[in-house]
Amino acid sequence: MSIRRAGTLIAIRELHGIAEFEQVSELFDGIWHFDPDSRPITVELMRAMSHAGNYVAGAYDDAGRLVGASVGFFGAANTLHSHITGAASGHGVGFELKLHQRRWALERGIDRITWTYDPLVRRNAHFNLAKLGARPEEYLPSFYGVMTDAINQGSDSDRVLASWSLSAPHVAALVRGEPCRRPLPADAAVVLADEDGRPVTRDSDASTLLVALPEDIEALRVADPGAAKAWRLAVREVLGGLLVEGGVVTAFHDKAFYVVERPSLGTASSSDRV
């Protein structure tokens, strides 16, 4: 599969050889600067996963340089779990990799892809929810324990599990390039706000709630670790709490707020479901 992005021809294909997996490992190291003793994926594991029929793919520019890669494995029924995806910024490679992954899954009768991401990173939330149409299903506190890579170093590794329903109408529309924006209800209320860079929680009985994120959590971790930790705990409490109660994240508004719909009266919370 080949596409043209920002004037560059990008070819995406499945990978099978050791030399290709070594290129992927180098690409990922260049993005995350992993501790050599705690890499999330190794050359040997990519080889085994590819041989077993899982998803290992790379994106190459017209000069033959690897500019993106993605690794996923079969999980629950009819589900592919995307373990790691990394790409050079600025060329839309990450989006094209996800579309390739979607086509690959649908060809195999898979209708759902899941992955985890840091719920505090605005650009990731916008990409996952607004561009792809995925929806957060579960809040996972300190999912990977304390991480040591250059981006996450020293931070609690809270994640949300994103679920991508590949054949959902809103996903199909986004894939076709059609925006799916719904206006906020007039009574939508902010329950986590950003006030001078600090998180402030608010009470509300509204059915549509907005959960703010910091402008740049990665920069904040370096400039003000205390504020970064305060945001982590606040989002864990507010967004995580709403998901546990059965709230549904329906959008990411204005590149800054999760939009959460409260469950209607009589709807069981996640802890009550069989």
Language-model features, listed with the residues they occupy:
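Conserved acetyl-CoA pyrophosphate-binding loop and the N-cap/start of the following alpha-helix
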Residues: 92-100
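Short amphipathic alpha-helix that is part of the acyltransferase structural core
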Residues: 1-45, 50-51, 58-60
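Conserved GNAT acetyl-CoA-binding A-motif
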Residues: 105-120
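Conserved catalytic-core motifs of GNAT/GCN5-like acyltransferases
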Residues: 116, 126, 133-152, 251-253
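A short helix-loop-beta-strand connector motif used in the catalytic cores of GNAT acetyltransferases and
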Residues: 47-58, 155-157, 243-248, 255-258
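A short, internal acetyl-CoA/4′-phosphopantetheine-binding micro-motif in the GNAT/acyltransferase core
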Residues: 83-92
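A conserved beta-turn-beta hairpin within the catalytic core of GNAT-like acetyltransferases
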Residues: 74-82, 206-210
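Conserved beta-strand in the GNAT
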Residues: 56-58, 64-73, 81-83
